[in-house]
A protein has these predicted regions:
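Substrate/cofactor-recognition hotspot
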Residues: 111-112
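Mid-chain, well-packed structural core segment of small domains
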Residues: 66, 73-99
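Short amphipathic alpha-helical surface patches that mediate protein-protein
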Residues: 86, 103-107, 122
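Short hydrophobic interaction/assembly module
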Residues: 55-74
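Short alpha-helical scaffolding segments that buttress acidic/His motifs in well-ordered protein cores
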Residues: 45-49, 66-71, 101-106
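A glycine-rich phosphate/pyrophosphate-binding beta-strand-loop-alpha-helix module
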Residues: 96-100, 116-119
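Acidic, glycine/proline-rich low-complexity segments that act as flexible tails and inter-domain linkers
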Residues: 1-61, 90, 116-131
Length: 131
């Protein structure tokens, strides 16, 4: 969590560590390969998303992953959903819990979005050997 006295660099480094813990080396490619055009986005994702918000003490990483899966399913964001499915496994979310999240989300996001999300979740789980 960013405090008044903390520098942006500290939040960035904390976010970098958390990204690597969640997604492993494959999840670091977009940051490590960012050029001048892409770096502002990667800085925001790393520093704000992971260094400031994901690292707050109010929710566990597992619960944050579960919430993120449900939100991304509702937004029909397949690339982000696949990335966060993989990160969720690293945060202790089981395949069965992911199935239940998608089933529950289906009631609120609709069948087309749920069907796409289920397909992308299956692909992500298979890719990391968690299916």
């Amino acid at each position: 969590m960013t405090t008044k006295d903390e520098t942006n660099g500290e939040a960035f480094e904390r976010g970098r560590r958390l990204r690597e813990e969640m997604f492993g080396p494959a999840g670091m490619k977009s940051l490590d390969n960012a050029d001048d055009f892409q770096m502002p986005l990667q800085d925001a994702v790393t520093r704000i998303c992971f260094g400031e918000v994901w690292s707050r003490p109010g929710l566990s990483p597992k619960l944050r992953s579960m919430l993120t899966i449900a939100i991304l399913a509702g937004q029909s964001r397949p690339d982000q959903l696949q990335n966060h499915i993989k990160g969720a496994i690293g945060n202790g979310v089981s395949k069965e819990e992911i199935r239940e999240i998608l089933l529950h989300a289906m009631l609120y996001v609709g069948l087309p979005a749920a069907s796409d999300s289920w397909r992308h979740a299956t692909a992500a789980l298979k890719e990391i050997g968690a299916y």
